[in-house]
């Protein structure tokens, strides 16, 4: 029996053929921490008696959740990571001088390479599977173990093959592909599985869409999401100073999958996930008929804060205004994206329409700052989670959607179908 991409990546790192279900220890190619999780890892590192990082050039700290600091507590948290980075002369330390949300910034910097094994103390580390790497979120103490040893242990996950076929319709994107999958299988439908995304739809999907797709693999309970390297991947990597030599793997034709799911996208509409689970997806045509007033629209995050998302929003908002009773916040995922969006005129369009454009931050997504919801408010958001209280008040409501649905809803002041504007 052949192997899946995920099994092959582990086999290459372990030095022998491995299969799903095996417990293995292997070298890590990249360890990722942020301003929320890294201080805990640093404490565990120091408590262990360790003095040096096993692989300092394979450790990245990205201050992205509450930077610039929102209060004294977050400033002190950032200070812990900052001082540790300076103490160990970390090559890959990113703060206000080179800002970005970690799961957008690191691929942009060439620090994610096909064939890598990557861990991060953030659940959406699975985003990096879009580049043909194994990437998964772990706890802060797991991160500390990797910092000390350069290794970690894993149970090789069985794979679910998801085959998307057909052509995406108007205003249907990678976000809709993953919301539709989660709608079908639920938030635990891929528990500790590798979601391997394939099919002609994926072949024609741009990198931004692929990042969105893999980003939300965890919302189905998956250990990782992964897409095989192709010409789209290679084009994305072509101008990056890659940290390592890529090791490209493809699943064998006779690879063993726990399940195969086929999704025909030809008639797929934009999907909007109602509160309070990402699995509560409905077609936008249905939601748009419900006259659901919107208090806030948020476009950003590691899911949908990329250049194409800002371009989509600008296209819809050009010559229009955000509804009087609605506020709109746009948060580009990195400074590079922000600069390019400004260069192309997108930022002027958004501001003229009445949107607020902020620096890169995870703040709004987790209800930290820069977009907190008040009691009983309703938000259409391009983020990845809509749990109770996720973006603020426990009585608020979050509807997850793509950037076109979000922008159209900002203009209409209620949940709207962008195809009808």
UniProtKB/Swiss-Prot annotation:
GO process annotations (BP): L-leucine biosynthetic process
Keywords: 4Fe-4S, Amino-acid biosynthesis, Branched-chain amino acid biosynthesis, Iron, Iron-sulfur, Leucine biosynthesis, Lyase, Metal-binding
Example GO molecular function: metal ion binding
Cofactor(s) listed in the protein's UniProt record: [4Fe-4S] cluster
Catalysed reactions, as listed in the record: (2R,3S)-3-isopropylmalate = (2S)-2-isopropylmalate
Similarity field: Belongs to the aconitase/IPM isomerase family. LeuC type 2 subfamily.
Cofactor binding, note field: Binds 1 [4Fe-4S] cluster per subunit.
Protein name: 3-isopropylmalate dehydratase large subunit
Species this protein is from: Nitratiruptor sp. (strain SB155-2)
EC number: 4.2.1.33
InterPro entries per record: Acnase/IPM_dHydase_lsu_aba_1/3 (IPR015931), Acoase/IPM_deHydtase_lsu_aba (IPR001030), Aconitase_4Fe-4S_BS (IPR018136), Aconitase_4Fe-4S_dom (IPR036008), HAcnase/IPMdehydase_lsu_prok (IPR011826), Homoacnase/IPMdehydase_lsu (IPR006251), IPM_dehydratase_rel_enz (IPR050067), IPMI_cat (IPR033941)
UniProt xrefs under Pfam families: Aconitase
